[in-house]
From Swiss-Prot:
Belongs to the MTBP family. It comes from Mus musculus. GO terms for biological process: negative regulation of cell population proliferation; negative regulation of mitotic nuclear division; protein localization to kinetochore; regulation of protein ubiquitination; traversing start control point of mitotic cell cycle. Residues 762-772 have a biased composition (Basic residues). Residues 802-822 have a biased composition (Basic and acidic residues). Interacts with MDM2. Keywords: Cell cycle, Growth arrest, Phosphoprotein, Ubl conjugation pathway. May play a role in MDM2-dependent p53/TP53 homeostasis in unstressed cells. Inhibits autoubiquitination of MDM2, thereby enhancing MDM2 stability. This promotes MDM2-mediated ubiquitination of p53/TP53 and its subsequent degradation. Inhibits cell migration in vitro and suppresses the invasive behavior of tumor cells. Residues 563-587, 701-822 are annotated as: Disordered. This is Mdm2-binding protein.
Length: 894
């Protein structure tokens, strides 16, 4: 990660110019180390101090993050510097981040600082010539506003997250430090860098713990003495962030902030290191940009004996807490990790995004967004999510304790990084070993010899003896087939056994596979003596004898499979919609029962039909499985009585039907409800001759039937019936869906056919059954003369019969849509007749068809049939003239 240093100084009084000769080169360090007098803290002096301190601390052999992908190697780390200084009533700020060149004696930054200091000095001298009262009357708030705006402009030029580490050094005035309210704008700009850019703030001063206590608390800054501020920047820091531990099952997460990784100088370099730097002269790899994650994620605890030695690298780092850390939980975690010594380690991963191009600064972290966010006055400051595009990779680190709150982080090679490098390192190790054998060293190095236990030696000798017996039998067999004497001489037998032993030790592993795998983790000095007397690495013998365990085979995966695995890791904590409804799918997915051909044929007849009824698969969803009733089939379920069927459990059966035709009752009730809801707002016809009791009317009143545009359509009614029946099937368990709120309709006409909806209280289903007309009973109860009552009764009954017959015959002959078509044709005919286009006219057929189509096109958008007849007339009258002219013109052309 690149390092960005920001120097912020708040000083009073007069600047001492470096160009004036008051400070000689090299004396600024002694002036700071002395405590007798106030040191001369100009921006140039501080820059020289930091540059010299960083240059002395940087070691070229310190460990850095290597390449984590095949795209290329990361760019070398760079250092940048910027300054924002306030002196009296004047301030200046760097316009951009300037790169620090440690190999140059003087760089561009010094020229910029010198020019700014001279400008500031001239401004201060001008102020001294003016009156002191006018100088004090200058608005100090505007000065801090201007300084804050300059800092915001610098923050907008920072790279994307994960690319830079920012260190801010604040040097306030010791005599009269500003209060928090006065310098709030510039402190807010520093807060922006602290929260959204993960900057580290250091306040240096003699009495800053007292004078700048509130500022330090607001910025979570560490306070150091003035003499130690140059040591506050640690050049060995490669990464700063937090440690995250997640609980995948419940989605819990805990963070430990203020951790850092530091590079260390390697003490020894192994010959079997997977680094292929010796090819760097021939192959020039491309440069890429690394964007590191903000957190070191915990993976698992690991036993060192279970970790293959080929995955270990020689690159090591130090994990520590940042300087002046005050987080107790972070200190406690560091103590726990530092106690991991010996056989156990903690495995962590540092995410990294690799990009071929430099990603521009994101707009989500801009100063404008910060001002808008702080204007809302949030209780807690949250960092916006920024998506860095590129190749997703990471570094696996094995953490082990070093004591005294220090941890060693060893870099592990991933499967993609070890591809091919393992075999290459083995070959390289062989070459070095053979070259070293030419010049033997004394005394003899016994550590290079292999170490075996007693059981392993005995097992090897037993295998060798059996192998020699087989070789001897084969030799006798061949001599007999060649008609040679079977007798062996002593020299021939000795040479045969020696050759057999040599071939056995040269081409076969003397250890079993399990023991060989265990030895690779525990035995450090491994080698096998071959026929040439040279020492072979133990890993090469492992690679020859057990190819299935080669590390290269772990990376021979399909790209699509790896992408699916990454997608599952990203979305593994989020439940799917089907799992939210049905529960998590428990049990292995690949647990399929495979049948032989004979076993499969047992379940089918000679015709290819199944032997028995098909049974549903037992699929467990959730914690409570759906237990099926044993020996139950659809045929058996149909003949069971209701009491027994309701206690059974069968796949797909949500409810059972009783013996009282509940489905027909539901259909009748839905038909009744659909009619009531459809025609509940229509008016009724009343007569004052005699009252009729109020009933639920499933049919429309005669007044509704008399209107041609309000005749109920039979097809639509049947469609609603089917819809309601299917809806009741789905909602049969919800009693509130079966009993919607009913509306009462008064039917006081003697011409209507009354009916009554009956409700059975013993069952959960309602039905409406048509009954005989009750008008006779209602009328007979009135105090009327007997003759008139009988006449009225006979008239009423005959009128009801005629109305019922005419209505039923009309519904059987003509549907609603057919009636609307007939009505529209009659309206079109009458309209054309008024315009002197009768049936005898030659253009009557064309005009009527054209006017019918146009009128039908305009009438199809109507949402209700009320007033349909008037709309037909209006539409036909509006379009009849245009239709006649169009038809006449068309016929004249013919």
């Amino acid at each position: 990660m690149d390092r960005y240093l920001l120097l912020v100084t708040w000083r009073e009084g007069k600047f001492r110019s470096v160009a004036g000769g008051e400070i000689e080169p090299g004396t600024e360090a002694t002036s700071l180390e002395s405590t007798d007098k106030q040191p001369d803290l100009t921006a140039t002096n501080i820059y020289h101090l930091l540059k010299r301190s960083i240059s002395d601390s940087i070691h070229p052999d310190d460990s850095t993050f290597p390449a984590c992908s095949v795209g290329g190697t990361p760019h070398s780390r760079k250092w940048f510097f910027a300054v924002q200084a306030i002196c009296g009533f004047y301030q200046f700020c760097s316009s951009d981040w300037q790169e620090i060149h440690f190999d140059a004696e003087k760089d561009k930054i010094e020229d910029v600082l010198q020019a700014n200091i001279e400008e500031c000095q001239s401004a201060v001298e001008c102020f001294e010539e003016d009156d002191s009262n006018s100088r004090e009357s200058l608005p100090l708030a505007d000065l801090y506003e201007e300084s804050a705006e300059n800092l915001h402009q610098l923050s907008d030029k920072l790279p994307a997250p994960g690319r830079a580490m920012i260190d801010i050094i604040l040097l306030p005035s010791d005599k009269d430090p500003p209060k928090l309210k006065e310098c709030l704008p510039i402190v807010g700009a520093l807060k922006h860098l602290k929260e959204w850019h993960s900057a580290k703030v250091i306040i240096a001063g003699s009495y800053c713990e007292i004078n700048c206590q509130k500022i330090a608390e607001y910025l979570s800054a560490s306070v150091v003495p003035l003499e130690e501020f140059r040591n506050a920047i640690d050049p060995r820091e490669l990464w700063r962030g937090e440690i995250q531990m997640r609980e995948r099952k419940f989605g819990f997460e805990i963070s430990f902030p203020e951790f850092c990784l530091k590079g260390v100088t390697p003490t020894n370099v192994s010959a079997y290191n997977l680094n292929t730097c010796f090819l760097a002269k021939k192959i020039a790899s491309s440069k890429v940009f690394h964007y590191y994650g903000p957190a070191l994620e915990f993976v698992q605890m690991i036993k060192l004996s279970d970790l293959p030695s080929c995955y270990m690298s020689d690159i090591e780092f130090e994990l520590e807490v940042t300087g002046h850390c005050t987080r107790q939980n972070s200190m406690l975690l560091l103590e726990q990790i530092s106690s991991l010594c010996g056989k156990v380690g903690a495995l962590f991963v540092l995410p990294c995004t690799v990009s071929n191009v430099l990603i521009p600064p994101p707009s989500q972290l801009a100063s404008r967004k910060w001002k808008e966010y702080m204007a809302k006055k949030p209780k807690t400051i949250s960092v916006p999510d920024v998506a860095v595009k590129g190749e997703f990779s990471g570094y696996h680190l094995l953490l082990q304790g070093m004591g005294k709150r220090k941890c060693r982080a060893t870099l592990l090679h991933s499967a993609s990084q070890i591809n091919g490098s393992f075999a290459l390192s083995v070959i390289h190790g062989k070459m070095k070993t053979k070259a070293g054998e030419a010049r033997p060293s004394f005394p003899f190095d016994f550590s290079s010899l292999p170490r075996f236990s007693e059981e392993q030696v005995l097992q090897r000798e037993k295998q060798l003896a059996s192998f020699q017996v087989l070789a001897l039998k084969e030799c006798l067999k061949r001599r007999k087939a060649a008609n040679q004497p079977e007798a062996f001489s002593a020299d021939e037998l000795k040479s045969l056994l020696a050759l057999t032993r040599e071939r056995f030790l040269g081409h076969f592993d003397v250890l079993p596979t399990e023991a060989a795998l265990a030895q690779t983790d525990t035995v450090k000095a491994a080698g096998v003596v071959n026929d040439d007397g040279t020492v072979e690495p133990y890993s090469s013998s492992l690679m020859e004898t057990n190819p299935l365990e080669w590390p290269e085979r772990h990376v021979l995966q399909n790209l699509e499979t790896s992408e699916k695995a990454k997608q599952k890791m990203r979305t593994g904590s989020l439940p799917r919609s089907s799992e939210q409804l049905l529960g998590h799918k428990e049990g292995p997915r690949d647990s399929l029962t495979l049948l032989d051909a004979k076993e499969l044929l047992k379940y089918f007849t000679s015709d290819g039909l199944p032997v028995g009824d098909l049974q549903p698969l037992h699929i467990q969803r959730g914690e409570k499985p759906f237990v099926l009733t044993p020996e139950l089939s659809p045929g058996k379920l149909q003949v069971l009585p209701f009491e027994k069927a309701s206690e059974c459990h069968y796949h797909g059966i949500e409810y059972c039907l009783d013996d009282q035709k509940a489905l027909e009752r539901d259909g009748g009730f839905s038909e009744l409800q659909s009619r009531l809801i459809r025609y509940e707002t229509q008016t009724t016809c009343t007569r004052d001759s005699f009252p009729v009791p109020t009933v639920l009317s499933p049919l429309p009143s005669p007044a509704v039937l008399s209107e041609p545009q309000s005749v109920p359509e039979g097809e639509a009614l049947q469609g609603e019936l089917r819809t309601e029946v299917s809806g009741l099937k789905r909602r049969s368990k919800d009693p509130s869906c079966l009993y919607p709120q009913k509306r009462l309709t008064r039917s006081e006409s003697s011409d209507c056919l009354p009916s009554q909806a009956s409700c059975n209280s013993n069952h959960h289903h309602h039905t409406g059954k048509p009954r005989k007309p009750q008008a006779e009973r209602c009328v007979s109860g009135l105090p009327l003369p007997g003759r008139e009552a009988s006449k009225d009764t006979s008239k009423t009954s005959s009128g009801q019969k005629r109305a019922h017959e005419s209505k039923s015959s009309k519904q059987m002959k003509e549907s609603r849509s057919q009636k609307h078509t007939r009505m529209l044709k009659e309206v079109v005919k009458d309209t054309l007749k008024r315009h002197h286009i009768t049936e005898a006219h030659e253009s009557f057929t064309a005009c009527s068809q054209r006017l019918f189509d146009i009128s039908k096109f305009y009438l199809k958008d109507l949402k209700t049939s009320r007033g349909l007849f008037e709309e037909m007339k209006k539409t036909a009258n509006n379009n009849v003239v245009q239709v006649i002219e169009w038809v006449v013109e068309k016929m004249s052309k013919k």
